[in-house]
Amino acid sequence: MKYFYAINILFFLTVNIGISQTQSEKKKIIGTYNKEEVSSLQSFIDRVSNERNLRVENFLTQNPSVDRNKVIEGQSYQIFDVLDGEPIYRTVDNVNSAIATRTNFLHNGGGLGLNLEGQNMNVGVWEEHHARNTHVEFSNGTFPPASRVTLADYNSGSSEFSDHATHVSGTLIARGADAFAKGMAPQASLVCYDWNNDSNEVEAEIQTNALLISNQSYGVPIYNSQGGQNAPTWMMGCYNIDAQLWDAIAYTYPYYLQVLSAGNDGQSTYTGGVASGFDKLTGDKNAKNNLVVANAANPSVSSEGDLLSLAINSSSSQGPSDDGRVKPDIAGDGTSVYSSTSGSNTSYGTFTGTSMASPNVAGSLLLLQQYYNSLHGQFMKAATLKGLVCHTADDDSSKPGPDPFFGWGLLNSKRAAEVIQEDTSGGSLISELVLNQGEMYTKSFTTTGGSPLQVTICWTDPPGGNQSGSLNSTVPALVNDLDVRLKDPGGFIIHMPWKLLIFNINSPAIKGDNVVDNIERIDVDAPVAGTYTIEVTHKGTLLNSSQDFSLIVTASDFSLSNDEFLSKNFKVWPNPVKDQLYYSFKSVSQGDVNIEITDINGRLVYKNT
């Protein structure tokens, strides 16, 4: 038998991240959409939106003294819905941020040599108002300058710029005219909408432009800034119709990931929650398929990218969801973030909140999509991206495993990018798979042990049942319950995934059968050397008879056991390459082996048989 191996290598002198969200890439993603599911989703969005608008209009008609919009202590509030007869308002919930999440290692001149800055990539932002698109940070660096920010629904007669929208957008894509304000993806483009009709507009952007990532730094707070309770008690932690709606969008469009702020109610207290000091997430922040971001308080990181200290900002809203799911999902740095503001084309400001942590994460994830596409010619599904960043996040060492403060930990863009690179040479595994009804998926791999071993599965789950009005309902929102198990080399020890204890949420996470989360991660801190076997199964009947899922595996000297994946035994170093390239290959075949090494632009740089 003859084996052929084509290996992509990064060369410092020739690297050029040119593959990104081109029209052909957009068409490829758009071509995967199911027209019947799209039509059903659009009807659902319209129904929810129309019913909500009718409730608001009827309330305003019956209460003419109440304003739809108001400003309290400089913060804007707008009636979002009317529940239990009361108006529900919503409100808005960076060099240092890039360092904290190690995103700077991906930039031009960063320690990984990747030169990823969002070239030809696009991100969506929904905000209370619009970003000042003429700000110097949003120019494309040409003369005459052109803005990289498109104001999609801006009306010069009635729309306005806001500091919040301009600051969030700067955290995402500021080019670094002021070096201290450089954003996560400083060469990316951004489309900005106000928050009215957000679900309709997101769906349209996905349909038209294959939107991969959106940032939404707003939500329904527990209290307004005058101290009055804004949200009904049942709403905190509840999988309500808003969570259901955004899960429906994600399930219909599996490449789209909604990134949003957890909220700033960390110090708020109320009566009737799951536990004192917890259960403060509202609306779509309780969805399953999005990425909800907590606010870390200026994490300390070494020059090599190692985390030195980690603490949560006390204002960051705590989870979990009422059914015990891990929420928030991950943490970013949103404390004292310096970025652009709307006062002028050269104004800046320092803000704190999960509103700032969310774009820190969203912009970083855009670069990870860019990198993966440059190596594979396609983007990751949202479940793969979410699973990857939760797999590689830095854990809060005071509480091993996930928790309702940080989620899975602080985003580590550097480690996530390294796993993407290792996957191409067999040092780790990132795989997008399908589990059919009644099947068991198995995969074996070997490791030399010593350093931690991790296995993660993540999937975009169908929307669950609407629990609106139910206080602290523990009914799982999970529809397709997949399970991952890991057998040790002797087959006698079965390692289980993490899970939270909803009835004792103050206690650390434990390991066991997880029946609520659509991400499951197994950690083995001190694995023995040998061959391990991953098993993925499901409970009950799978909706639609199958479930796509993503698998991420990292371990010391990792290698797959199957001949089918023999190319994973091909090792190349260093990568990126400066002067000399080395490779080794341990063959289990007596057949011929053809080796071709190309750079990421497709140029052949080495060939041998």
Segments from the language model and where they lie:
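N-terminal domain-start motif of subtilase-like serine proteases
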Residues: E37-Q75, I79-V125, L151-F161, D242, ...
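Noncatalytic accessory or regulatory domains flanking protease catalytic cores in secreted, cell-surface
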Residues: G349, P402, D481-L551
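Catalytic-core environment of secreted peptidases
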Residues: R132-H135, N140-F143, A296-P359
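Short acidic, glycine-rich surface-loop motifs adjacent to enzyme active sites
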Residues: T208-Y239, L257-G263, C458
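Residue-level detector of functionally pivotal "anchor" positions at catalytic/ligand-binding pockets or at interdomain
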Residues: V553-W573, V588, R603
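Secreted peptidase-domain scaffold signal
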Residues: T14, G409-N480, L551-L560
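Hydrolase catalytic cores
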Residues: G332-K399
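Subtilisin-like serine protease catalytic core
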Residues: Q21-E25, V92-S214, Y223-Q226, T252-L257, ...
